[in-house]
Amino acid sequence: MNRTISKLLSPALALGFLLGIHEGRVALWRDGEARPEQIYDIRADTLPPADRLQLSRGIRAESREKVWLLLENYFD
């Protein structure tokens, strides 16, 4: 896990989930986990720059439903 995600993971624990980038792909971390729970087949370099920036900073989600809503944007 890169340092940016490590720094973002602790504050995200209260919210439950964090979407970010792991080894060039969109990934999902669950609270308390050092490794991604799921790595999606979405290459970060294929996303628009604004999306890549958001993911590199980490996108917090309080529920799995919110995660799926966020992911729908990247699968389109």
Give, region by region, the residue ranges found by the protein language model:
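C-terminal partner/receptor-binding element of secreted or periplasmic proteins
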Residues: 51-76
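Flexible, solvent-exposed short loops/turns enriched in glycine
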Residues: 26-56
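The feature represents the first ordered module of a protein
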Residues: 1-36
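Glutamate identity and glutamate-enriched acidic tracts
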Residues: 23, 33, 37, 62-65, ...
